[in-house]
Regions:
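A short, structured active-site edge motif that brings together acidic residues
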Residues: 66-79, 102-109, 136-139
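Acidic-and-aromatic substrate-binding clefts and catalytic sites of carbohydrate-active enzymes
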Residues: 22-26, 44-54, 78-83, 109-114, ...
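Beta/alpha (TIM)-barrel catalytic core signal, keyed to glycine-rich beta->alpha loops juxtaposed to Asp/Glu
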Residues: 108-283
């Protein structure tokens, strides 16, 4: 698996496996085991996904050495402050049955992110986290976080797909040494992604699926991607993107699909902020 070096000096796989919406315990455990068997080493979960215990169980069952894995989890909103971040992190670590996590992210850009960040800086210094980062932060919020803290985020996990390409945010992150990571690279199939004529034509040229074309496009932009599936054959397909390269013309054709609009929602929509901040979970 190819990796990218984060600003902490550690290596992060460029292709990862996410477990968002895997609420069935047995299915989640089996999916993580299958993903590791297929070659994935980056496993991405979150306290809010309510499946950290299942991820931890699966990791133990695989027998893969801990230093070969890259495990990410995330701080949910209700504890986005100094004391809350410290406490929720320990609960996540216990559920994952690990001594440390490779990457810990603030899941949403709300609450006392500065207090939570200072707690995360201390956890990193204590060796419990190898790298700290954020999710869904626009560049202005990142600039604010960087200005008033010591550690520059290692990763910003944001929505990136052919319809929302983050053409301004991605270069800004990269220019500050922050690694972009794509959630929902397939936009959950919205806008007819898997049947899109541009993507299907490019796929036919290389004998690849639309999913493989999208993941390769993200890969060539230097962005880490997270693909999710409970089917092992799809996991194997999604990771098999290193044996072809999109041409400059292919990249331009995909760039033309950008709408600069989320396939889901805006993190600056007041109604969405109210909904997210009101979502109290048992984490």
């Amino acid at each position: 698996m190819q990796t990218v070096k984060l600003n902490t000096g550690i290596e992060m796989p460029l292709l990862g496996f996410g477990v968002f919406q895997m609420t069935d315990a047995a299915e989640c455990e089996r999916a993580v085991i299958d993903a590791i068997d297929a070659g994935y080493r980056l496993i991405d979960t979150a306290a809010s996904y309510q499946n950290e215990t299942q991820v931890g169980n699966a990791l133990k069952q695989t027998g893969i050495a801990r230093n070969e894995l890259f495990v990410t989890t995330k701080l949910w909103l209700q504890d986005t402050h100094y004391e809350g971040a410290k406490a929720q992190f320990e609960r996540s670590l216990n559920r994952l049955q690990l001594d440390y996590v490779d990457l810990y992210l603030i899941h949403q850009p709300y609450g006392d992110v500065h207090g939570a960040w200072r707690a995360m800086e201390e956890l990193q210094q204590a060796g419990k986290i190898r790298a700290i980062g954020v999710c869904n932060f626009h560049p202005d919020r990142l600039a604010d976080l960087i200005a008033f803290n010591h550690v520059v985020p290692a990763v910003n996990q944001i929505e990136v797909n052919p319809f929302n390409q983050q053409l301004q945010a991605v270069p800004w992150n990269q220019s500050r040494g922050i690694q972009p990571e794509a959630w929902a690279p397939f936009a959950e199939g919205k806008n007819g992604l898997f049947q899109h004529p541009v993507l299907t034509a490019i796929g036919q040229k290389y004998g690849k699926s639309v999913g493989q074309v999208v993941l390769r496009w993200i890969f060539q932009r230097g962005i880490v991607s997270l693909a999710k599936s409970v089917r092992k054959e799809r996991m194997e397909e999604n990771i098999n993107i290193l044996d072809f390269e999109l041409s400059g013309e292919d990249m331009l054709q995909i760039a033309a699909l950008d709408t600069a609009t989320s396939a889901f929602f805006s993190h600056r929509d007041p109604a969405m902020v109210e909904w997210l901040t009101g979502r109290k979970l048992d984490v």
